[in-house]
Design a protein with these regions (language model features):
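Enzymes that bind and transform nitrogen-containing heteroaromatic metabolites
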Residues: 1-164
Length: 164
């Protein structure tokens, strides 16, 4: 299982249920990596999408504790155990965790690859991703050249869980 996330220099990922910044090439990378795949998210992440609707051309799996929550064209699960059971139906190489904060934290132990867009700026944030740089289980295995979008410098990084 993989995850995909954009973080600032403090590993911030969001503020008031929105991304910290919108970078077109990051959005394009997200689309290219997740199109036709299974994506895992929490309810608040789904509700942050335009119209609160699932992303097209992907299997959208949403974790929520609300037993009455229903959204067309989504698979709704209510526990991590139920999610893991549901995910057995899909190729683990084609599953991406896409947020938010609590879903990332709960699913990180099941992930072996993390695609991280690292933004060289500290934004105001109220949601964070675990700092993989300080986690001895993870290492950077690929990185892009630094990119610039207006005054924003960023880089695409691939982290992999170290083999035991």
């Amino acid at each position: 299982m993989k995850l995909i996330v954009a973080v600032d220099s403090n590993w911030g990922i969001g503020l008031r249920n929105a991304l910290l910044v919108h970078i077109p090439s990051d959005m394009k990378f997200f689309r290219s990596e997740t199109m036709g795949k299974t994506i895992i998210m929490g309810r608040k992440t789904l509700e942050s999408f335009p119209g609160g609707q699932p992303l097209k051309n992907r299997v959208n799996v949403v974790l929520t504790t609300d037993k009455n929550y229903k959204v067309k064209d989504t698979v709704i699960v209510h526990t991590i155990e139920e999610m893991l059971d549901e995910l057995k139906k899909y190729d683990s190489e084609d599953i991406f965790v896409i947020g938010g904060e609590s879903i990332y934290r709960q699913m990180l132990p099941y992930c072996d690859v993390a695609h991280v867009t690292k933004i060289d700026h500290a934004y105001e944030a109220d949601a964070y991703f675990p700092d993989l740089d300080s986690d001895p289980e993870w290492e950077i295995t690929a990185d892009s050249d630094e990119q610039v979008y207006f005054d924003i410098t960023y880089q695409f990084l691939k982290y992999e869980r170290k083999k035991a």
